[in-house]
Amino acid sequence: MSKKIYSVITGTGSYLPTKLVRNQDFLTNTFLESNGEPIKRPNEEIISKFQQITGIDERRYIEDEYVNSDIAFFAGEKALASAGIDREALDYIIVAHNFGDVKHGSTRVDIVPALASRVKYKLGILNPFTVAYDVPFGCPGWLQALIQADYYIRSGDARNILVIGSETLSRVSDPHDRDSMIYSDGAGAVVVSAVESEEPVGILTHVTRTDTAEQVFLLQMGQSFNPEKGDDLYLKMNGRKLYEYALKTVPTAIKTAIDKSGIPITD
């Protein structure tokens, strides 16, 4: 049996911010409806219902002195150490994010230069053929970046790729929007390497979909529910609709991927 090239995760790394924010920390927030009117329920009730639905009772926020590319770098450094490879041997660095570097106290998005280029710089990589680029792809961005890495490796174009997913949603969340409790910050990274094998190993199949007919604006940028915040833009979502969408589509996508792999679901 002839050998084929497969993509295998050979190293992992992550960064978990140290700033811990518990649900009770939102008790003093002034939560508003989208029309700017106060929500006519006590914060205790709002928070209790949120925890009941999501199971979330705490989250991490990035430290004031860092930005997104910093924590992406921290995770990437750990992944390279875990893989034990020469960083100059990387063919690609792919960073999945949506808002770039947003400084503490600001909502201004900074995506030039690309976060992947900033990470490459912070890693001290001098190889000009280590191609660095970003993937802005919403919540599943890291998975889509991993899929792209898999294509590069299977084609023979690359041998080692650093894939990072990093986000600092706390910097673009509206404190007057109850949905802000679901957002948090952090970074994760993997090194994906080419492995020749007679048997399938590593990444076997994938499924991706983009639904826009009714869902395109379930996540969007919008002004604060507090008119006094002015024209600054914050991440807004239709939480209930997104929840219903996930329940409907994610299991189907998982089942399709399993079927494509040929692996029985019982395994």
Give the location of each predicted region.
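Condensing-enzyme catalytic core mediating Claisen C-C bond formation in acyl metabolism
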Residues: 1-65, 176-248, 252-256
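Conserved beta-strand elements of the Class I
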Residues: 8-10, 91-94, 162
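Conserved catalytic cysteine-centered active-site region
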Residues: 43-69, 102-160
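Buried hydrophobic packing segments
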Residues: 72-79, 145-152, 254
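Phosphate/pyrophosphate-binding loops at sites that engage ATP/ADP/AMP, CoA/4′-phosphopantetheine
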Residues: 75-91, 253-267
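Secondary-structure boundary elements
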Residues: 84-86, 126, 151-160, 193-200, ...
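Acidic, glycine-rich active-site loops and adjacent beta-strand->loop/helix elements
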Residues: 96-102, 136-141, 165-170, 209-210
